[in-house]
């Protein structure tokens, strides 16, 4: 016990000694030290700001459940009309309803976006146009949507095409001042709807569940949700992506019935599959469903289906903006350029002290001691660069909206992990940059130095 304590005390004493030498060296070479600190701080800060944006854009939007959520795809376009053999990212009405009615998953959800004219139940507010989603009732439970008041509607409401609606907290504040509005009515497109739930502030980023049907997955959240069956019954047109192949019926789709019976893809679908066995079973069901469509003559090509998890789906849809990925690459390149310059500056710093190294070696200092001394000095400089990097990172986060899209910039946050990573990057980069200069310093021959300075 005492031997270990003495060894620890001796190590701490040596570390203090090395830091003292580093401090003296920095005071002797103030300009070089300041330049190295500036380079490390700028390089680390640039990387961290870009990383914060990339992390926000590429983050798992529902990490506690993403392994259970999947997107089914069915190729109803055929090899002559699909994209490089891949099925459409959305489903036709025929396939979407078949999926919903089959109930082969724990939960299944259909989604399509639309615009609604909202008129509150009083004369104090003017009508407004709001973005909404038509969804099946499992939507709120599947995606763990938080409610401030009330809840979602029931399966029977779906079956009865009930005139019910769930509104966002923002719309509730606008119409009812944030009060509990459950049970009250609003008009949507001149039809009365009863409010059954008010969502809490909820905006998954990216909005992964309808990323295939929206133009931009980082846009503002939907303001209202109505039953899918109700929207279909009212012939509510989709305001989001609508894909038709050249083999679809009349491409202009003159009426609602034509839309429902066409091979156009416009409905997003999700299924919840808790276990791996459920995933395999559902994948088999998808294949068998497509094979049945081929057998009855609807498809004249072999089954072509996909079942993708959240992470894979976001990659397929290329959700991470190219600007954020490119910015990260450029920032890392800038850090590498800084490192190259730091290597040269540290080499100049260390080799100017060759006489000092020669004297220390002549007095019995080992090469290991020289390594420890100069790497400690590099770590101290890196730590100073990290502190500067923290300030520059905070400053960069303030002006981040001027470089990146505002919708993505608002997602980037300066948290404790980013602060720690900034310092860690600066210290690590400084140590890496010091390896070659330290090796050169340790090769100094004491006899030659003493003779040349004699």
Segments and roles (model prediction):
Residues 1-19, 24, 28, 32, ...:
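Membrane-helix entry/capping segments
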